[in-house]
Amino acid sequence: MQAKRYKPILNDDKPYDPTILLELNVNSIIWGANNFASKLPDSPKWLVWYKKPMGKANDDNFSDVELAWTNIKGKMCKMYPYLWSGLLREGNRDLELKERVHPTQKPVGLLINILNDYSNPNDNILDLYGGSGSTLIACEETNRNCYMMELDPYYCQIIINRWETFTGGKAVKIN
């Protein structure tokens, strides 16, 4: 089976520097941080999303896990088993897109679990890499205020469409 090809992510060809996030001096969860861990403060706090079905043979095309660094006080390493492998998917299908549209797309159900563990209702959640909009939908479901940014107009439109479909609302452009 050949892997799906996604639209390239703008600026993904440049080295990532998380310094700006750290300068915000706020509680952070940074996905993919294992790829630039040397640029982050040491932390015993990592989230591990285990996304393969138990007992399934390794598929060299995809990682069995995704890692996220966190600096949230009082929380140590935490494993989140949440099936997301090809057609095999866990959770409420009404919350998810019918197919993946972004190469680093996260399932809404996984993000709901993480938001419930690491934040409270009415908290402000900042996602500077909106991608497919999963964080926005998870915030809608858990009564968090989501502030999201996405550089690529293509993915911005996916996020807007997804939010409008999910909420029945109409996005308003603010100048």
Residue map of PLM features:
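Class I S-adenosyl-L-methionine
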Residues: M1-P15, T19-N175
